[in-house]
């Protein structure tokens, strides 16, 4: 079902290329290096920015007690031989904007980045972070021609972390004790699975009333917008970088973590030809398997509504191309 690339680079020192040296990209570079996961190549089109950030991170190595190599560059040739390519390049949201409003501007950026990166790292696994996430992942999949296990979007890990955070704040408990999962698109139609959320194994339905749970679900759906409205000058970057580094870690260390990941579906959940967030097992080959949960009728309906919104934006992009 899933391909296993016969790649010589899997036997080399691990290297992660990050395309886009903005706040998410640069914070992700820091996370990966300081967790001692891999060497990092940070690429951006603006001269001096990735080089300066790389030097800054290099100067912190002695303090952070690691010896990872960090390169800043404007040349895709320097990303050659990367095991993982993370695409964060693109314009961030501004107050009042939805993730879908970024479609026209960011699609061209992501497609070009994907084509350039795959030319130098043909065996790499790709993680897309740029918004609108699900559509950008679909376009990157088309641009690279990769098997679906080697290209994925980071959304569900972040959305699940937000849901867990709001549950923990409501109950006054340790966030690490809260486990939750959010499926669907990375937007207003995401599907937080309340009945699967637990605190140390106790379902939150036994700890919180239905009205409170629905309030936390709605806050989760608007979690990104809440930060954009507060900051006024951009969106979240600490939590997105942490969520992406968790995916990188699971792949490089072959941890087989079960995480919600945006993937091209081929019939799972009765959905086809769409990228959307579902539970997946992440390991050395990227997405090792897709897990099909036993969803209720209302959960399945919500997932399908979410998928239709992604398909609508894919068609919107195609119409823009033809206009």
Curated annotation (Swiss-Prot):
EC number: 1.1.1.37
Binding site for NAD(+): 20-25, 44, 106, 129-131
Keyword Oxidoreductase attributed: yes
Protein keywords: NAD, Oxidoreductase, Tricarboxylic acid cycle
GO process annotations (BP): lactate metabolic process; tricarboxylic acid cycle
Reaction(s) the record says it catalyses: (S)-malate + NAD(+) = oxaloacetate + NADH + H(+)
TM stretches of this protein: none
Matching CDD domains: LDH-like_MDH (cd01339)
Active site: 186
Binding site for substrate: 93, 99, 131, 162
Pfam families: Ldh_1_C, Ldh_1_N
EC class (word): oxidoreductase
Oxidoreductase found in the keyword field: yes
Gene3D superfamilies: Lactate dehydrogenase/glycoside hydrolase, family 4, C-terminal, NAD(P)-binding Rossmann-like Domain
Listed GO MF terms: L-lactate dehydrogenase activity; L-malate dehydrogenase (NAD+) activity
Family membership noted in the UniProt record: Belongs to the LDH/MDH superfamily. MDH type 3 family.
Role description: Catalyzes the reversible oxidation of malate to oxaloacetate.
NCBIfam families attached to this UniProt entry: MalateDH_bact, PRK06223.1
Name of the featured protein: Malate dehydrogenase
The encoding gene: mdh
């Amino acid at each position: 079902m899933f391909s296993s690339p016969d790649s010589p680079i899997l036997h080399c020192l691990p290297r992660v290329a990050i395309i886009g040296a903005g706040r998410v990209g640069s914070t992700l570079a820091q996370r990966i290096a300081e967790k001692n996961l891999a060497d990092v190549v940070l690429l951006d089109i603006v001269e001096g920015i990735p080089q300066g950030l790389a030097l800054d991170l290099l100067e912190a190595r002695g303090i952070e007690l690691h010896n990872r190599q960090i390169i800043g560059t404007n040349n895709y040739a320097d990303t050659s031989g990367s095991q993982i390519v993370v695409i964060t390049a693109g314009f961030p949201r501004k107050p009042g904007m939805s993730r879908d409003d970024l479609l026209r501007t960011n699609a061209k950026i992501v497609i070009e980045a994907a084509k350039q990166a795959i030319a130098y790292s043909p065996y790499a696994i790709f993680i897309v972070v740029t918004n609108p996430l699900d559509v950008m992942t679909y376009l990157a999949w088309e641009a690279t021609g990769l098997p679906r296990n080697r290209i994925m979007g980071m959304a569900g890990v972040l959305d699940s972390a937000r849901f867990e955070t709001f549950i923990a704040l409501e109950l006054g408990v340790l966030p690490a004790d809260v486990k939750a999962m959010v499926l669907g698109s990375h937007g207003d139609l995401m599907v937080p699975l309340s009945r699967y959320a637990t605190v140390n194994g106790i379902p939150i339905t036994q700890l919180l009333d239905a009205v409170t749970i629905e309030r936390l679900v709605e806050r989760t759906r608007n979690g990104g917008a809440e930060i954009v409205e507060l900051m006024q000058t951009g969106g979240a970057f600490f939590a997105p970088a942490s969520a992406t580094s968790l995916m990188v870690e699971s792949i490089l260390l072959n941890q087989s973590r079960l995480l919600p990941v945006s993937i091209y579906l081929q019939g799972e959940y009765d959905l086809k030809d769409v990228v959307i967030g579902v539970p997946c097992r992440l390991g050395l080959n990227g997405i090792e398997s897709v897990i099909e949960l036993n969803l209720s009728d209302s959960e399945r309906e919500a997932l399908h509504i979410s998928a239709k919104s992604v398909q609508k934006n894919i068609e919107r992009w195609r119409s823009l191309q033809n206009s």
